[in-house]
Amino acid sequence: MASAVWGSAPWWGPPPPAPARPLTDIDFCSGAQLQELTQLIQELGVQESWSDGPKPGADLLRAKDFVFSLLGLVHRRDPRFPPQAELLLLRGGIREGSLDLGHAPLGPYARGPHYDAGFTLLVPMFSLDGTELQLDLESCYAQVCLPEMVCGTPIREMWQDCLGPPVPGARDSIHRTESEESSKDWQSSVDQPHSYVTEHEAPVSLEKSPSDVSASESPQHDVVDLGSTAPLKTMSSDVTKAAVESPVPKPSEAREAWPTLCSAQVAAWFFATLAAVAESLIPVPGAPRLVHAARHAGFTTVLLATPEPPRRLLLFDLIPVVSVAGWPEGARSHSWAGPLASESASFYLVPGGGTERPCASAWQLCFARQELALKARIPAPLLQAHAAAQALLRPLVAGTRAAAPYLLRTLLYWACERLPALYLARPENAGACCLGLLDELGRVLEAGTLPHYFLNGRQLRTGDDSAALLGELARLRGDPARALRAAVEEAKVARKGGGLAGVGGGAH
């Protein structure tokens, strides 16, 4: 039977080759071929994905259960910690841009040399309805003014040791909105500890690693090491010092006289309580092992070693937060993906550590739940481009005060507002999007500020290290293909469990 013919080729034959586009697919700045960059970005995405690694599900689930059990033991030691909390778990640590904490010292940790994968866990201490807040209209911070009672709980008495003086002259700036929101979070009950964690009757004195800050160097024991896996050298500037307690005024029903909840003291209490529990743990065979805990810029970083080969080191940034119902006045209510605020809208207050913070009592506004919902609406090629740019940026910002990782995440949202969705969704444009994000970041570092995505009229600041980072970024931008190849090779080594090779002699 004769075959049908389209032109001069049978219909079952191969399609004609696509026309070559070498003259239009070259990066003007570096001369790199965009097609090669896109292929490297896709390969990096495959290598950095833990979903295809050896037994990742069991490792991650055990580690998550271990952390939740640890928080349950914290509640047993100090009832102020909520017995049941609606936790929000984010992939990526704070040093990878999961949250905005300003340009604060975040410790010496670097993904690869010190840990294989990072996560951020927001732990609400309690919830407010927004009437207790006093927003600073010129910044991204707020004061939490505590009344005598919240939902029948003597909240002021409970947090007596973390209170500061009232803040005069501020006003309440929270209101509720009527639009809709769709965001999902992780819920976990932490009232019953799992079998992965057991506790001694009395704390055990643990030997400190000589390469870490000893207990005598920090009055609040801001670094605790329970093993010798990673020789993390923590300089004194990398560790948040204990805040000086402020005098507490006598209780008064006038809101202007309500004492404020000091974020620095809450962060210090959170770490001290968690460290006391961590020092009293009994290792359980087959369970993750907590080997390091330290406090940085208002949050606590813990490192867990997985029990089975290939052994991995997981980083969890635990941050005590206050959950606030409502929506801040002047905040964005819609995005390219739809409404952000609804009748059930809420946001968080986190203990920020930036130098622009008005005082030690101030809390930074955080929209992690909304960002989680936005991320689900970002086209996959753009997410790949962002992950690649983040991987290239990682060695440049390790150990610095630069806020570049979260600035890069914010540029991701602005790109979705500015560029056509069809362009961002095309896989072949991942290389161009990655270069575009790096170029935009360079312009932000040069300008020193970036408009806040959620808070209209507010600015994110780049930090004191932006000038040095700008020079490093320019050198990287001159040969992005080489930087991507190096990132792919590092990801391959880490995927095989090589990220821990030679760290602390391989002991976990």
Curated annotation (Swiss-Prot):
Cytoplasmic side of the membrane: what ranges? 279-508
- Is ATP-binding one of the keywords UniProt gives this record? no
Q: Where in the cell is it found?
A: Cell membrane
Q: Where is the composition biased (Basic and acidic residues)?
A: 172-184
Q: Which InterPro entries match?
A: MAB21L/cGLR
What is the topology of this protein in the membrane according to its UniProt annotation?
A: Single-pass membrane protein
Which Gene3D superfamilies does the record match to this protein? Answer: 1.10.1410.40
**Extracellular face of the membrane:** 1-260
What's in the keyword line of the UniProt record?
Apoptosis, Cell membrane, Membrane, Transmembrane, Transmembrane helix
Protein's GO biological process: apoptotic process; positive regulation of cell adhesion; positive regulation of T cell chemotaxis; positive regulation of T cell migration; regulation of mitochondrial outer membrane permeabilization involved in apoptotic signaling pathway; response to cytokine; signal transduction
Query: Entry's SMART domains?
Result: Mab-21
One GO CC annotation: cell surface
Complexes and interactors: Interacts with CSF2RB; this interaction occurs preferentially in the absence of CSF2.
Please describe what this protein does. Answer: Selectively involved in CSF2 deprivation-induced apoptosis via a mitochondria-dependent pathway.
List the protein's name: Transmembrane protein 102
- This protein's species is Homo sapiens
